[in-house]
Each structure stands twice: as structure tokens, then as C-alpha cells.
């Protein structure tokens, strides 16, 4: 099994607590308003805490149409979440799972920095192509910025 690690940081003027709430705890209510059409459908099994499963269907026409996420850890006071992508065509047939750790850290100016670490567990010696990682990073940034704009406006 191969392992690849990718890190991403995005800064915001939105305070850490508000960003974590909007980006993680209330994302299923905010995202349809902030980025209509980003998801086609979301089926949730669980209360949002550890063990919750989300099956996400994305719009047709993109390189990825399905993914299933499992919440592995959640610290509401520390503004962190651990979740894994465990199924769907997002795994491209050569990834076993993607472990993600996301933390929202307060900054000195009252804003926040969202830090994400993704660990790709690949089958055999498969390697996730850099263009796939860049595409995922661009999608994450787009959704983050949509949520950020929504939080600033509301």
C-alpha cells in the first residue's frame, strides 16, 4: 500500500469558531445556499458526530460523481475534524481511502487559518497524479471561499 500526503492552508477574516461552525457543523445547511449546485444530493446517516456517514452525489459532467465520507473524530471546542473518504468514484479505483484532518486555527487579527491534511492510501504502488491533487485542492478552495462569503454576508 502506498501513502501520499498533501497539505493545504487557507486564511480568512472570519473568526475560527464561526468558520468551523459554517464549514463543518452546519455545512449541509450552508453549502446549498453558498454554492447552489455544488452537490446534487447528500444522504446522512448519523447525528454529525463520530461514525456519521455522508453519501454525496455531485453534479453530472465532472470527473467525480460520488463519494462517501465517514466522520472519524470531532472536537468542537478545538475546531478539528477527522474524516475519511471510504467509497465512491472519487477513489478512482486505485485509492483505498483518503484520511483527512481539518483544523481551524484562530489568527492574531481575529480571523482564522483552515489547515487540511489529506493522506491518500493507494493500492499497491499506485501514485495519485499531481493534476488530481491540484483539482481537489481547487475544488476545496472554491467551496471554502463560497462558505466564507456566505458567512461574511450573514
Swiss-Prot record:
Gene Ontology MF term list: abscisic acid binding; protein phosphatase inhibitor activity; signaling receptor activity
Family (UniProt): Belongs to the BetVI family.
Protein's UniProt name: Dau c 1 isoallergen Dau c 1.0301
Keywords of the record: Allergen, Pathogenesis-related protein, Plant defense, Stress response
InterPro entries, per database record: Bet_v_I/MLP, Bet_v_I_allergen, Plant_def-hormone_signal, START-like_dom_sf
Domain of life: Eukaryota
Gene Ontology cellular component annotations, sorted alphabetically: cytoplasm; nucleus
Induction / repression: Up-regulated by abiotic stress (wounding) in transgenic Dau c 1.01 or Dau c 1.02 gene-silenced carrot roots, and to a lesser extent in wild-type roots. Up-regulated slightly in transgenic Dau c 1.01 or Dau c 1.02 gene-silenced carrot roots in response to biotic stress (infection with A.radicina).
pH dependence remark: Stable at pH 3 and 25 degrees Celsius.
Natural source organism: Daucus carota
Thermal dependence: Melting temperature is 57.7 and 80.3 degrees Celsius at pH 7 and pH 3, respectively. Not heat stable, unfolds at 95 degrees Celsius at pH 3. Refolds partially at physiological pH 7, but not at pH 3, after being heated to 95 degrees Celsius and cooled down back to 25 degrees Celsius.
GO terms for biological process, alphabetical: abscisic acid-activated signaling pathway; defense response; regulation of defense response; response to fungus; response to wounding
Ranges annotated as spanning the membrane: none
Tissue: Expressed in roots.
